[in-house]
């Protein structure tokens, strides 16, 4: 069985990690260092 605390930590970490990656990619895109030609 998965512990409720561990399950909560995982469910809380996944969105934060995705948000962090999105923000990092957005910052690179705004700097013009993106391969998308922005």
Swiss-Prot record:
Topology of the protein relative to the lipid bilayer: Single-pass membrane protein
Cross-referenced Pfam families, in alphabetical order?
A: PetG
Name the UniProt key words of this record, in alphabetical order.
Answer: Electron transport, Membrane, Photosynthesis, Thylakoid, Transmembrane, Transmembrane helix, Transport
Task: List this protein's GO terms for biological process.
Answer: cytochrome complex assembly; photosynthesis
Location within or outside the cell: Cellular thylakoid membrane
Subunit field text: The 4 large subunits of the cytochrome b6-f complex are cytochrome b6, subunit IV (17 kDa polypeptide, PetD), cytochrome f and the Rieske protein, while the 4 small subunits are PetG, PetL, PetM and PetN. The complex functions as a dimer.
The free-text function statement in the UniProt record for this protein reads: Component of the cytochrome b6-f complex, which mediates electron transfer between photosystem II (PSII) and photosystem I (PSI), cyclic electron flow around PSI, and state transitions. PetG is required for either the stability or assembly of the cytochrome b6-f complex.
Provide the family line: Belongs to the PetG family.
Record's protein name: Cytochrome b6-f complex subunit 5
